Amino acid sequence: MSKRLVAYFSASGVTAKVAENLADAIGADIFEIQPEVPYTKADLNKKARSTIEMSDPASRPAIAAKRDNIDEYDTIFVGFPIWWYVAPIIINTFLESYNLKGKTIIPFATSGGSDMGKTNENLAPSCPGAKLLHGKVFNSYSSKADLSAWVETLSL
């Protein structure tokens, strides 16, 4: 079995819960993608920081710390909340911080009603040479069994 990492960004705690359950369910290591400048509730307003970042394709919010041993992982699950039908721009920052050539990247997201939208289309340029699989959206009630069953369908 390949070595797996679950890396996630969570603004409200929902994605963190799903990421922890996923890592537990599949025996993966876990890493929280933390912004250098944490998001506040006010930053998530449609007229605030998150919208400004999401409106600028060149924006790359800084990450507080990198995962030192990323080379050890063959498969990286990347979790995030859906913002405006795509991944938050900080996910692009994370992916672009490493050479992911030859790795399998699997996005997963949390949302109260959105699907993955154009997530893969927006993430693909940030992980050249990696195999980017189509992801899935989960809600806060997703169990370890649900997550494990999803991973089984990926035939990793």
Describe the function of each predicted region.
Residues 1-78, 85-87, 92-96, 145-156:
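N-terminal beta1-alpha1-beta2 submodule of the flavodoxin-like/Rossmannoid cofactor-binding fold
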Residues 13, 79, 102, 112-117:
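Glycine-centered flexibility sites
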Residues 78-79, 107:
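Redox-cofactor binding/interface segments in oxidoreductases and associated redox assembly factors
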Residues 84-85, 113:
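Acidic catalytic loop of the alpha/beta-hydrolase fold
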Residues 96-102, 125-127:
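Short, conserved loop/helix-junction motifs that constitute active-site signature segments
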Residues 106-143:
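Short, glycine-/small-residue-rich phosphate/pyrophosphate-handling segment
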